[in-house]
C-alpha cells in the first residue's frame, strides 16, 4: 500500500452481477471462512462486497511504502529515473514483505484458523509483486511492478497462491486497464 493513498470507501452495491460466475467460482465455499484485509476502507469494503462479510482479521503486515515525493503524479506519468530518484523501494524490500505475507497467510493464519485457505484482500502493487516473486522474478523493480510490467491485475481480479505447492493462478474479471 502507498502511504497516504486515498483511503476511500467503495459502494457496497457495486458488486457486478457476474463476478461470482467469472471469478468467484474459483474460491470454493469451504475456503471462504478466513478473510484477511489491509486496514484501508477500500479493502475492508471489498471483503463485504464480494463475500458479504467483513474480514475476520485486519493486518498491517501487508505494509506500505512512502511516495509523497511523487506529489499528485500518477505512476504511469513519470519516468523510471524520476521514480527512482523520488522513491526508495529496492526489490529486496519488496521481497522481504512478500516472504512475510506468504508466511503469515500460508502458515500462521491458516494454521490458527484450521483452514486450507486464507483470502487476503490487498493492494495492486503487493499483489503484482507476489505474482512476480512466485513466478521467479523477485528482482523486478518497484517501477516495473507499479506500472504492471509483465503482469496486469485490475480491481475484482483474483490471484490464487498455493503456498504449499508454490503455484499461482490468475483469474481476470475483465480486461486489464492500460494507461497511456
Predicted regions and their residues:
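Active-site-proximal alpha-helix that buttresses catalytic centers in soluble enzyme cores
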Residues: 1-57
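Generic structural signal for well-ordered alpha-helical scaffold segments
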Residues: 21-28, 99-110
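Short catalytic/ligand-binding loop motif for oxyanion handling, primarily in non-cytosolic enzymes
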Residues: 1, 42-46, 65-68, 127-130
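Short Gly/Pro-enriched loop/turn and capping motifs at secondary-structure junctions
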Residues: 125-128, 136
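Acidic, low-complexity terminal tails and accessory targeting/binding regions
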Residues: 10, 26, 57, 64-77, ...
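Beta-strand elements within well-structured catalytic alpha/beta cores of enzymes
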Residues: 1, 36, 112-126
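Active-site catalytic microenvironments for nucleophilic, acid-base chemistry
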Residues: 49, 53, 104, 108, ...
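Phosphate-handling substructures
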Residues: 2-11, 50-104
